[in-house]
Amino acid sequence: MTRQGMRDDLRGEADSVVHDGTDDIDNENDIDNGIDNENGNGIDVVLVTGLSGAGRGTAAKVLEDLGWYVADNLPPELIAQMVDLGLAAGSRITQLAAVMDVRSRGFTGDLDWVRSELATRNIVPRVVFLEASDDILVRRYEQNRRSHPLQGNQTLAEGIAAERAMLAPVRASADLVIDTSALSVHGLRDSIERAFAAETVAHTNVTVESFGYKYGLPMDADTVMDVRFLPNPHWIDRLRPHTGQNADVRDYVLGQPGADEFLDSYHQLLNVVIDGYRREGKRYMTVAIGCTGGKHRSVAMAEALAARLAGSDALTVRVLHRDLGRE
């Protein structure tokens, strides 16, 4: 079952809740906490909660980037059903995260109920609690021009105070508390990645795309490299009909002076760039390699580069040959 299909099944008759944007932080203290998976049944469950505006939405996005199935603002009564679907799906879905907030009535009781329900399934959910100082929360709400969910006819500061008091018991029992007052989005991402580092590898998705310059540059490329410095197999009669995926063409291209040196140097350069992208929270990268027609040299070099990149456990690599078949 796809994530979207699972989400649709779970929502059923529940009303949709639109995320208001105030939980995406935009503002670094150092947090070095880790939380261990206590479940022995292969399903790991995390409940993300905390003060409105403290960064729950950002935390949810980080977990999703790390490969978790994330349900944002799922009604509490459906969280146990979400876990049941995860259990039924076997090992394909092993990490589930649910975002809970005070917009659900009787929030503290709801959280206790969810914990109790999951306990009957031999699952001990971990609770991540996000908070921030009052002045930071006020600033974030004012910047987003949103009202606090508990504000009502009160002032913004009073709404924040009411929520902080309501959630005090939840904070006290949380497995991990993150204060986002001085954290940027990247800082929060780093904190969550460190907390879950023992069980999750932060993969970067790299697409290596070959193309022909005569058809234009790929618009989605993050970096472009030109391999027209290599001799063109087009001018060799026995190679012309074939593509860079053909063994003879590949051996010809990779056997040229400078081909291996290029691949070694470019591979090292990309490792530096990818590490920088990862620190900045960028999880997707397109590397374009071009030749004249996108049939021989760029195809062979793209395949060879992708094979080198695929040796890293932190990368998910795919190859795309944009212009094959256009001639």
UniProtKB/Swiss-Prot annotation:
Residues 1-29 are annotated as: Disordered. Keywords: ATP-binding, GTP-binding, Nucleotide-binding. GTP binds at residues 101-104. Coiled coil: none annotated. It comes from the Bacteria. The keyword rRNA-binding does not apply. ATP binds at residues 50-57. Residues 1-22 have a biased composition (Basic and acidic residues). One of its GO terms (molecular function) is GTP binding. Displays ATPase and GTPase activities. Belongs to the RapZ-like family. This is Nucleotide-binding protein Mflv_3714.
